[in-house]
């Protein structure tokens, strides 16, 4: 793995030079730190692999071993800075999903060089048409980010409470053991009973003692119930969404002129698929099942078994006359 990490220009490898630091730019090709200083001494230059104009201040340490992944991540970050609309800005969920699909298409085209010029013009046109919306969404914190921050804040508070509770319990237990030891010594000194009775009585009293209770300090809240310092506040009303008719699945019926094929459960119980080749692991991963092949063969075998031309002759003649 260390031999694969090499500079394409000077051929230095991580194996021969453990301190080798590979840098990557927007084009996705890597260069070592020494080559970057030599080629981009004036602040700008071209990539030796693809001749793309680059700037020296845009080089950064490579995070992924695959250069394509590094390039795609960089493109995604740049595109999402401009294509930053949220779901609340769309009247319907379908419009938002189409918007996300358009973003993925743009990222794919830029990363793979497909329709590069047309995609760049499309991005530039979007920036011009949505300049105000882009700046507004950049300044406004999205609800998802605020929700994550709220979760992190709550998680930190819970961890702090558990830590305080554990420290309190340890202190109380240590002090209680010290007091019990002193009380036992006093009883042994001043009591007239035998030492065995004193120790047994003391042990019974210790077991009956209740565990110390840790009381959390009350959190400061407003009259509305909002916590002080809670960062997430929804200051904008949601855009009313269009009511859409829910999709209802209706199974289609086909006229096969034959007996109906068995159901999927009957294929296993009645052993229809006994002599069907089982699906391979690759086929199962792709959604294939041996029941599909068995059911298709049965449907083809049963189709047309109950078709009698004499019964359908008049129907076929009338349909042909209407067509003519």
Curated annotation (Swiss-Prot):
Any one of the GO BP annotations: regulation of transcription by RNA polymerase II
Subcellular localization: Nucleus
Keyword entries, A-Z: Cell cycle, Cell division, Metal-binding, Nucleus, Zinc, Zinc-finger
InterPro entries, A to Z: Cdk-activating_kinase_MAT1_cen, MAT1/Tfb3, Znf_RING, Znf_RING/FYVE/PHD, Znf_RING_CS
Gene3D superfamilies noted in UniProt: Zinc/RING finger domain, C3HC4 (zinc finger)
Superkingdom in the source lineage: Eukaryota
First and last residues of each zinc finger (RING-type): 7-51
UniProt GO MF annotations: cyclin-dependent protein serine/threonine kinase activator activity; zinc ion binding
Listed GO CC annotations: transcription factor TFIIH holo complex
Transmembrane segments: none
Keyword rRNA-binding among record annotations: no
CDD domains per the UniProt record, alphabetical: RING-HC_MAT1
Subunit field text: Associates with CDK7 and cyclin H.
Task of the protein: Stabilizes the cyclin H-CDK7 complex to form a functional CDK-activating kinase (CAK) enzymatic complex.
Record's protein name: CDK-activating kinase assembly factor MAT1
